Amino acid sequence: EALTRDSVESAKKSGQRVSRTEAERKAKAFIQNIHHFRDDNLRTPHAPIEKVVVFDEAQRAWQKEQVSKFMQQKKGIPNFDMSEPEYLISVMDRHDDWCAIICLIGGGQEINTGEAGVSEWIQSLKTKYSSWDIYYSDKILAEPNTYLNDPDLSNWLQQHGHQRTDLHLAT
């Protein structure tokens, strides 16, 4: 939606006419659904063409058990043993040079059954991808029990990540 709006407004400012439908079509070609991204990368061990992925509502990513059940029942893949955050990081970690994962986290929402929360992203980075550069909003640690309520993971993030005040969408 934001890309569509921006494209139409930018075209207007430069004296061009772009229809909302055309802008939306281009935006959809630019953005891939996370589930398609996941499925595409199950088929290959190679790095994806995408260098940047944005995971909206990242706190809703699935725990290992939920993903494993889904992969077995819906995709016919037995013994899938990664959470959604760990899998996404593993796919992007295939790049030899650089890549980025941007996790957008909604505030004030309960975590539902099977959802991993922010802690699973941090746990995956801590246990398997500790060489990654991590940048996070100061809001992640500002309110106890809101985003990250595991003291060990909070401490690890503070020691290994880079806290920024300008990464919150309210900025």
Spans of features found by a protein language model:
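Conserved helicase motor core of SF1/SF2 NTP-dependent helicases
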Residues: 2-18, 52-171
